[in-house]
């Protein structure tokens, strides 16, 4: 049984390349001691992501591993159980029902209509960076506050509550800073907050925020239950910004490692769309897809996975599969890419369009304002999140060097 190498979180790709050379799926033991099956090639990954006998709800599978995962990932507190009634934990027909109810709130036109506001938020954050006397942490000052502000505005969260939302988000995501007690406290607080938010809307009237839209979502009289609504708000909070933080940070790091490419984006901002798509493939924000379980034996690449087993799909590995992508270790925005960074099948990320749009705006506004941005530390000194699910930096110190411009393109006043 394989173990994750010591440098896995910093650079997982050599490990993945070795695994792909040996087979499509491997048994591994995580650092928590949990045993799982890791799927590493593109075709097998897509097969698992759409396989009818691979489930999201561990209670629909049987076996020791599924029971262990269910015990470890739910039931910690009553709040945790209430936050589990969302799309990522559901299988058909429940998943189909939930997705039908919530999809209108994420309509492409509604997401694209946010672009002017996202641009304004980006420029406000860059204005603050422009006033810094020395190096700044681009994650702390830009990549994190941009999407969390967007999500909070979407959810109708008041400005004074957004710092608390950020703290809760950090606590519940798998990071070295997370503790069981901290996660329990954060989930309890999130449930209490959304309970009060829903009650306030029902008493005082609805707005144009996502919680209000979810409250009124209906399909032939079917509506979200209270706990389903709370769970969806929680999912939007966490999934709605974590991937974007990583996507922005990973992309900026990749560009700063190749200064001519960074400057080229400054000269040709329209190139941002294929650049973001290639970044999603090359070093995307999600390392491994969320947990899945076998409800019946399945065979992948000649290997049978028994019933009731935990299955992890390594999206980061699948997107560098040599049998599907030419020279996959090269960053090439000109390639025609059909990556699976946002998943595949019925669980394809509902917020993919929002994440893409935020990343495009974040990058073009950044390079416009700071065309000579550069790293403030050696790349080897950067710290990566120790999360099996997420692929992202803990910090990104940069010098906002050069002659910045303001939002109109004129030289900015210092």
Where do the protein language model's features map onto the residues?
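Cytochrome P450
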Residues: 1-414
């Amino acid at each position: 049984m394989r173990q994750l190498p010591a440098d896995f979180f910093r650079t997982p790709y050599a490990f993945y390349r070795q695994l792909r050379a040996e087979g499509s799926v491997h048994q591994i033991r995580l650092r928590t001691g949990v045993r799982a099956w890791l799927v590493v090639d593109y075709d097998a990954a897509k097969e698992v992501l759409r396989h009818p006998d691979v489930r999201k709800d561990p209670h629909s599978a049987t076996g020791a591993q599924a029971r262990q995962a269910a015990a470890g990932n739910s039931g910690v507190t009553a709040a945790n159980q209430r936050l589990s009634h969302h799309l990522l934990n559901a299988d058909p027909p429940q998943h189909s029902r939930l997705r039908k109810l919530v999809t209108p709130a994420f309509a492409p036109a509604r997401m694209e209509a946010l672009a002017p506001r996202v641009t304004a938020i980006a420029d406000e954050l860059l204005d603050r960076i422009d006033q810094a006397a020395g190096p700044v942490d681009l994650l702390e000052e830009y990549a994190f506050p941009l999407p969390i502000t967007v999500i909070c505005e979407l959810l109708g969260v008041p400005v004074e509550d957004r710092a608390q939302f950020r703290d809760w988000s950090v606590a519940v995501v798998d990071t070295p800073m997370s503790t069981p007690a901290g996660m329990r406290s954060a989930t309890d607080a999130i449930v209490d907050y959304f309970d009060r938010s829903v009650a306030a809307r029902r008493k005082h009237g609805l707005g144009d925020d996502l919680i209000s839209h979810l409250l009124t979502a209906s399909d032939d009289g079917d509506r979200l239950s209270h706990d389903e609504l709370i769970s969806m708000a929680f999912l939007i909070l966490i999934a709605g910004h974590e991937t974007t933080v990583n996507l922005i940070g990973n992309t900026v790091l990749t560009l700063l490692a190749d200064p001519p490419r960074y400057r080229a984006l400054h000269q040709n901002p329209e190139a941002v769309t294929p650049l973001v798509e290639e970044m999603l493939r090359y070093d995307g924000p999600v390392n491994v897809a969320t947990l899945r379980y076998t409800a019946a034996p399945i065979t992948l690449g000649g290997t049978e996975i028994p019933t009731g087993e935990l299955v992890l799909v390594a999206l980061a590995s699948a997107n560098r599969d040599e049998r599907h992508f030419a020279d996959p270790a090269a960053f090439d925005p000109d390639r025609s890419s059909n990556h699976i960074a946002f998943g595949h099948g019925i669980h394809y990320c509902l917020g993919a369009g929002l994440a893409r749009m935020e990343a495009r705006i974040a990058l073009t506004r950044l390079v416009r304002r700071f065309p000579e941005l550069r790293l403030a530390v050696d790349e080897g000194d950067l710290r990566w999140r120790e999360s099996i699910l997420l692929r992202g930096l803990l910090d990104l110190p940069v010098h906002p060097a050069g002659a910045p411009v303001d939002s109109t393109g004129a030289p900015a006043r210092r």
